[in-house]
Amino acid sequence: MKAEIMAIGTEILLGDIVNTNAQFLAKELANLGIGVYHQSVVGDNSERILEAFDNAFKNCDTIITTGGLGPTKDDLSKELAAKYFNMEMCLREELLCDLEDYFKKNNLEMTENNKKQCYFPKEAIILPNPNGTAPGAILEGENNKRIILLPGPPREMEPMFTNHVVPYLSKFTDSVLVSKILRVFGIGESKMEDLVCDLLDNENPTVAPYAKNIDVILRITAKGKNKEEAEKLISPMEKEIRKRLGDNIYGEGEVTLEEVVGKLLVDKKMTVSTAESCTGGMVASTLINYPGISEVFMEGAVTYSNEAKMKRLGVKKETLEDFGAVSEECAREMAKGIAKNAGTRIGISTTGIAGPGGGTEEKPVGLVYAGLCIDGITKVKKFNFKADRQKVRTRTMMNVLDWLRRELEKID
């Protein structure tokens, strides 16, 4: 089976709404072992939608549409799908009863145009929608071609697909695709690809690197008769990749770096405080996203001015005069100072020039120093980021968290 995902709606075509449905459907179809070779977006235009059906069926046997099932005149999906397969629309009385009950239960007035949502070809397989008013449907045409019509809102589409479409599609597949994602930080996509380049030509499982924000993911995908068989194919490949990338791999699946660091801090009972200048509280804010971090996170200080660095953190006036606020020496004293004053085992500091102004030849925009004081031992790292102000700050925060992760993993 080959499928195309087709979003129908001018609002998506113009970028007014982000098409998150396509990502969800692509992942779910991959899990079923169904190949998706094309995705398309079509506006609310009859001629163009019919043309899109024609083009899609040149390459696939299954079209999955989202959107265009509502009560308004520009909701055209099911009418055009029926026309494409030469099916006649008719009022489905059972759907009308369900719709009237929905409006009564929610104490809403049902306008006449809502009945439009109850018209489907008599041949259609109806997909119930307990989360909204527009049912979905499956229309099966000749030559093993089918159009699966799903509503546009994700909160309606996703459960409909999971509860009704997945069991239907499972009848047509004799294999499954299983993927495992390894999340990587500390090396760029090109460097990582160089380390695993010989593995990228493998066919089953396949290995593919993707840059995502400022970390990188490696997706290992295997096809098997069942999930267990596919996982057995993935296992030796994963071991080889972990051997090559080592502690640059920080997690699996959808886990974030902040979750990994938060868990390490809580599990190891390592109290922490932050003193930030150029990042303006981003490190602290990211850490406290982790549930339960209040057990170990004591304090976050934004010490932007030299005065605040001296008064709040105990940075020496001579240090600022001799080396400046953006220096290894200042970052060191900031990390030690916040750990001491907050009474925490870990103190983190950041100081740098985020831009766009303020840089010099000696200290350019993007120069950042970060300090990490753990149980009285202080280390400093120097970074040079070539990016705009927000990216300099974000990259600083991410690199500091990754550095902290690596240090925490060394502690028993």
Swiss-Prot record:
Q: Which residues form a coiled coil?
A: none
Pfam families in the record, alphabetically? CinA, CinA_KH, MoCF_biosynth
The cross-references to InterPro entries, in alphabetical order and at most eight, read:
CinA, CinA-like_C, CinA_C, CinA_KH, Competence-induced_CinA, MoaB/Mog-like_dom_sf, MoaB/Mog_dom
Q: Which HAMAP family match?
A: CinA_B (MF_00226_B)
Q: Which family does it belong to?
A: Belongs to the CinA family.
Q: What is this protein called?
A: Putative competence-damage inducible protein
Q: What's the source species for this entry?
A: Clostridium perfringens (strain ATCC 13124 / DSM 756 / JCM 1290 / NCIMB 6125 / NCTC 8237 / Type A)
